[in-house]
């Protein structure tokens, strides 16, 4: 239930985001949502870092801590990080340029445990020469795991994982997804 102040802010057009945090093996997870869906999933070293990141991404929004209201979103993301079994499927409030949204929607269609390249993704969205722009859209992606840019690789693997969230946090996720697929296939055979 929205507070009276939140109802007034909505009428005035003030953007309201509720957020909560949780620990995971990759660091602190912050999920922020609006009335339209999840507006950000951020990963960082501590609560202060992810809150600063949220504030920098949404400087004109009314940010409200709401651990209880974000609990189900946090649980889905943390469960995915701890033991990936399927895609993170949350209703998103996609915020970005038209091009970024096009990239992010295409990234969401990359199958669990599979990867593609920036080059292939650029071709897929109909902009084969926009490889760098596709990479930039992945770099600024505020929807960690729900828009799985960790599955998009540079054609030279040594240059991959340039996401803001960092190589050490994102690199293991593709391997974890592929391991889950292998284990699932092994269980079916047995």
Where are these regions (language model features)?
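Short glycine/serine-rich loop segments
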Residues: 129-171
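Basic nucleic-acid-binding alpha-helical/helix-turn surface characteristic of O6-alkylguanine DNA
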Residues: 1-129, 176-190
């Amino acid at each position: 239930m929205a507070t009276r102040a939140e109802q007034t802010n909505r009428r005035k057009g003030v953007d309201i985001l509720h957020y909560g945090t949780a620990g995971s093996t990759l660091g602190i997870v912050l999920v922020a949502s609006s009335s339209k869906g999840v507006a950000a999933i951020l990963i960082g070293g501590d609560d202060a870092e992810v809150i600063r990141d949220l504030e920098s991404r949404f400087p004109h929004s009314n940010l409200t801590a709401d651990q209880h209201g974000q609990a189900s979103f946090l649980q889905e993301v943390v469960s995915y990080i701890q033991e990936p079994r399927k895609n993170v499927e949350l209703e998103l409030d996609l915020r970005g340029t038209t091009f970024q949204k096009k990239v992010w929607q295409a990234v969401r269609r990359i199958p669990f445990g599979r990867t593609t390249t920036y080059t292939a993704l650029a071709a897929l969205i109909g902009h084969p020469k926009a490889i760098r722009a596709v990479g930039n859209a992945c770099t600024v992606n505020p929807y960690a795991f729900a828009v799985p840019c960790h599955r998009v690789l540079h054609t030279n693997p040594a240059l991959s994982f340039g996401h803001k969230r960092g190589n050490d946090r994102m690199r293991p996720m593709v391997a974890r997804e592929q391991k889950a697929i292998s284990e699932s296939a092994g269980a079916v055979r047995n």
